[in-house]
Amino acid sequence: MRRLGIPKNQTRIKDKENDFYSTDPQAVFDLLRYEKFQHHITEPSCGNGNIAEVLKHEGYQVDAFDIADRGYGYQKDFFSCKDELEGDVIMNPPYAFAREHIVHALQYMKDDSKLCALLKIQFLESLKRRDLFEKYPLTHMYVFRRRANVYQNDNRSLGISNVCYCWFVWVKGYKGEPTIRWVD
């Protein structure tokens, strides 16, 4: 069985700088229509703050940080967090290290805490993620009927994405099959 490992820090920083896709705030508002969260939320790949700002606007207390300084939150390597995470986790992780972000969050979350990650639908594919889904079964998946916009390096001039993004939701300790829901 493949080890649920973490890549070396310098590689993560270099790749993270080139793997930044900001989240359209509407995708967060859409998630909040379907999911309720604990008052405290950790956002470990906050980028320019689009997710965190929506959550704060909706009354949540947000701990927002990122491995790269993008002018929002504070700079911190999520993999250096070794204490139990408070509350739920919502993130749009760098795709190259999405699996590692998810595993790390689930390892340090309290039971029954929720993790939501905005990812390409293709994240379901791949033998290298099989162990993730077996050890930590998905609870829900929210598939956007219309494309959710993400912006490479926050460049909105590139227009609408042609990639299908989904909210992947885990509840730590959940055992069972996931539900798939569509977001209008």
Where do the model's predicted regions map?
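Class I S-adenosyl-L-methionine-dependent methyltransferase catalytic core
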Residues: M1-D184
